Amino acid sequence: GAAPFAAEGAMSDLRAVFSLQSEVFTILARRDANIASFDDLKGKRVGVGAPNSGVEINARMIFEAHGMTYKDVKVDYLNYGEAIDQMKNGLINAAFVTSGLGNATIRELGVTKKIAFVPVDGEARQRLIKKYPFYIESTIPAATYGTASDTPTAAVMNILVADKKLPADVVYDLLKNIFSPTGLETI
């Protein structure tokens, strides 16, 4: 979404160097809230991320793809740590998190509370990807958080960017070191 960054204008001096890990869009729900699908969020108290954060912008786009708005839920603007705490304390029913797979905070929540993962799939996911092509299809494998089955979702890729004035030999050396056997072993 360009809207939150419109005032700053295009960053035409940046160049993509390579893709890093994907940031998976995860919708967590307390199991006792009976939320199995996105539509089940209607009327529930939902943590959508801090205002204008990446998580919150993702949440707005995903609501839109499902034909819903924040008016359909009781929104709490919480960063994901706050949202997890609110879920632990029974103060919200669901939370949106954008992170790499295996997030320690999500794992910890799963140890202390019974949680479910809400899928982002079907036509809604296809609408999301069509309108915002920086999203990709993704899956949260069952083994990641000990769920009964994989959860379909969407993700965005983290990308290392550099100023276009950075000399090509510096970029080459960086990539050579990162993707060398030693570099890969280190990361």
Regions found by a protein language model. Give the residues of each.
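Short amphipathic alpha-helical coupling segments at ligand-binding clamshell hinges
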Residues: P167-N177
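Short helix-capping segments at alpha-helix termini
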Residues: G9, H66-K71
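Pocket-lining segment of extracytoplasmic ligand-binding domains
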Residues: A2-P4, A33, T69-P167
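Hydrophobic residues within well-ordered alpha-helices
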Residues: L41, M87-K88, L174
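Periplasmic-binding protein-like
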Residues: F179-I187
